[in-house]
Swiss-Prot record:
Keywords: Aminoacyl-tRNA synthetase, ATP-binding, Cytoplasm, Ligase, Nucleotide-binding, Protein biosynthesis. It is found in: Cytoplasm. A motif ('HIGH' region) lies at residues 123-133. GO terms for cellular component: cytoplasm. The keyword Nucleotide-binding applies. NCBIfam families: argS. This is Arginine--tRNA ligase. Its EC number is 6.1.1.19. Monomer. It comes from Phenylobacterium zucineum (strain HLK1).
């Protein structure tokens, strides 16, 4: 079931080809002047240079071939050779009926589905999430849902930061603070089972403890060589699976993951894999040996590197540092081992890394090393970077005291504002308290997510809670309000026994709504190709606006039966498509407000 833009594009291509003009020039787009036409093609201007003809002459010939197309009410030529296409009311009605009957509301799927991994979130053991994790989580979740909706087999991986020197620092800090735990770690290191049950004494350790101790330990590690050396030894003991260190580390990981899952759940974010850096630790030594066997490792002042620079690079990329001069595997080494692990377990055709754009060079270096090693084919690894969420001062968002705001606090702050906004608008006040809280939570998440996803991911934006939570303007709460309004209308229609029926298109607001519904596939395709959900967010907003104008201009329940049935069908199609779009954005719609 093609959308109108695609179907008309094929017709225009055929007309161009029949005139001896390359069909690929006949691109059809939504009209820049919707007051004059629904779609346009500027191909005659590009074709004129190619075939040596006057563009208006080409456009006239193409228009003549399109005149008999029943889908078109008119084909007109404007300016030097622009083709303006206006769709017939009957064709719009047929398209609306097809969208309304389609569970996917007119959305297609990719012709060749792929196996895809989306790496996003980026949480770390011992650290509660902060506002810096918000964009990775929101954008990554939406990209995962988008690719899944288009038909790909997709795995979302949190890529848990749970290994390395910081774990040794934490083990030492916890042991220093709790003599019983220190004694138990020593005892278990001597004669324990790393796969056994976590001792009750270890269960006393909370995420708040880890969050408090880590910055102190990190600072001391920089100042005190003996403290740093002990942390390195504890890290080595952990990586050797010494039972005391390993069981305490498991407690760190478990208590962190529980808190992280709670925060992610509040945001409507979930993962298929919670794989950590620890999951690939066993691969690193054999991988390093393999890189050496392939002649990719180069000794460099005691370190071992992979050179990734290419002829023609506009700037010099440093090599991938695989093993430090001290013999330690590095951060990029773990990333490379993760690529290898994913290839063996899932063999993805595409891995998307949703990480701050400031990490672009790091990923380019790792990806090139992976291509050299044969762990992925060129182009299978892609970093989609994003900008920062800034305060009103234009700098990355912080608390009033200048500290980093925890994500849980940001969510609660937004939920509190959502409650206030609901009360101001007189919404949900007659509902049970539990339902009101659920609605406030959905409004808060919609506010945060739409504010982020309505921007192209590469741009930064200013955090403005008052604007984000408004029920007016281009906001998540506005979209929820429009969706709930359609639900209310359809419930009322059902109570009155009103039935949906075949669509007829007569009013300008009906035309605009159907054309907007038809644009869903174009928005999905753009979002998918660019890995940029803002195209879909923009469509959801335009659809909400189009329905609002239709609702104001076209009586529904008060209309005579044939017209009422048609307009109810348009309302049903709008709701389904809007809910699908919002779900891909990770936004849930309440039943009522």
């Amino acid at each position: 079931m093609s959308d109108l833009k695609t179907a008309l594009g094929e017709a225009v291509e055929a007309a161009f080809a029949a005139e001896g003009v390359p069909a690929e020039l006949a691109r059809v787009t939504a009209s820049d002047r919707p007051d004059l036409a629904d779609f346009q093609s500027n191909g005659a201007l590009a074709a004129a240079k190619r075939v040596g003809k006057n563009p208006r002459e080409i456009a006239t010939a193409v228009a003549g071939r399109l005149q008999g197309d029943p889908r078109l009410a008119s084909v007109e030529i404007a300016g030097p050779g622009f083709l303006n296409l206006k769709v017939a009311d009957a064709a719009l009605a047929a398209r609306a009926d097809a969208i309304a009957a389609d569970p996917r509301a007119g959305a297609g799927t990719v012709p060749a589905p792929r196996r895809v991994i989306v790496d996003y979130g980026g949480p770390n053991v011992a650290k509660p999430m902060h506002v810096g994790h918000l964009r990775a989580s929101i954008i990554g979740e939406s990209v995962k849902r988008l690719y899944r909706f288009r038909g790909d087999t997709v795995i979302g991986d949190a890529h848990f930061g749970d290994w390395g020197y910081q774990m040794g620092l934490l083990i030492g800090a916890v042991c220093d603070e709790d003599a019983e735990i220190r004694a138990l770690v020593d005892q278990l290191n001597a004669s324990g089972d790393p796969n056994g049950e976590i001792p009750a004494a270890f269960e006393r350790v909370t995420l708040a403890d880890l969050d408090r101790l880590y910055p102190l330990a990190a600072a001391k590690g920089k100042e005190d060589p003996a403290y740093r050396d002990r942390a390195r030894k504890l890290t080595a003991d952990l990586q050797a699976h010494k039972p005391g260190c390993y069981l305490l580390w498991r407690r760190f990981r478990d208590v962190t993951q529980v808190a992280l899952e709670r925060d992610f759940h509040a945001l409507g974010v979930d993962f298929d894999w919670w794989k950590g850096e620890s999951d690939v630790d066993h691969l690193i030594q054999p991988m390093v040996a393999e890189l050496a066997d392939k002649g990719l490792l180069v000794d460099d002042q005691g370190a071992r590197i992979v050179r990734v620079a290419r002829e023609g690079d506009k700037r010099e990329l440093p090599p991938l540092l695989v093993v430090s001069s001290e013999g330690s595997a590095m951060y990029g080494t773990t990333d490379l081992a993760t690529i290898l692990d994913r290839k063996r377990e899932f063999d993805p055709q595409l891995v998307i890394y949703c990480v701050d754009q400031r990490q672009a060079d790091h990923f380019e270096i790792v990806f090139r090393a992976a291509y050299l090693a044969g762990y992925a084919e060129e182009g299978q690894l892609e970093h989609i970077g994003f900008g920062t969420m800034n305060g009103t001062d234009g700098k990355p968002f912080k608390t009033r005291e200048g500290g980093v705001l925890k994500l849980a606090d940001l969510i609660e702050m937004t939920r509190s504002k959502a409650r206030e906004r609901l009360h101001e608008a007189g919404l949900g006040e007659d509902l049970p308290a539990e339902e009101f809280e659920d609605i406030a939570g959905k409004v808060a998440v919609a506010a945060l997510k739409f504010a982020d996803l309505s921007n192209f991911r590469g741009t930064s934006y200013v955090f403005d809670l008052d604007r984000f939570t408004s029920f007016e303007g281009k906001t998540g709460p506005y979209l929820l309000y429009q969706a709930v309004r359609v639900k209310s209308l359809l419930r009322k229609a059902e109570a009155e026994g009103a039935q949906a029926g075949p669509v007829t298109v007569a009013e300008p607001a009906e035309r605009d709504l159907v054309l907007t519904l038809d644009a869903f596939e174009t928005a999905l395709q753009e979002a998918y190709d660019k890995k940029a959900p803002n195209a879909l967010a923009e469509h959801a907003y335009r659809l909400s606006q189009a329905f609002s104008k239709f609702y104001a201009a076209c009586p529904i329940l008060a209309a005579p039966p044939p017209v009422r049935g048609s307009r109810l069908t348009l309302a049903q199609a709008t709701l389904r498509q809007l809910e699908l779009a919002l779900d891909i954005l990770g936004i849930a719609v309440p039943e009522r407000m």
